[in-house]
Amino acid sequence: MKPLFAALSVAFLLGTSVSVHAAEQAKPTDRSVQVYKKADLAEWNRENAAGGKGPLLGRFAFNRHQTGAQDAFREIGWLTLPPGASIGEHKHTDNEDVYIIVSGKGLFTDSTGKQTQVGAGDITIARPGQSHALKNTGKEPLVFLDLIAETAAAKSASQQK
């Protein structure tokens, strides 16, 4: 119960909402699993993610609250931004965040403020110390795969600051 309370408290403090499947999210990742079937992915939706606008719809194999120090990949999931929705600019201090755009069109903003149109097949990355944002600029949902990885070197560097 404590992990669920902690997850909901963090979501409240960050101004986001977590779907009713949050209890599933608190379970540690079963490290013997090597295939995550789409039907079994846990739903985790947020409103106004990182100060963005509108819903961010997610289905995750696992998230950072379920992984341990031994895991490089901290989060893997399918994300969808409906038309007009966005993920606000946010900084990654001790991990890398990769978006692999599957369908739709969007505007990616990097840590320098440079904006780039992205679409199916494009890949974006925010490395430790970099920020990024993404907005759906099209008329169709913007669907992308989200991969967050953490390295010991990145974590060590962020803790030394």
Describe every region a protein language model picked out.
Residues 7-17:
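Bacterial N-terminal signal peptides
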Residues 20-73, 155-161:
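A short, N-terminal "cap"/entry segment at the start of jelly-roll beta-barrel domains
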Residues 89, 108-109, 126, 132-138:
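Short beta-strand His + acidic residue motifs that chelate non-heme Fe in jelly-roll/DSBH
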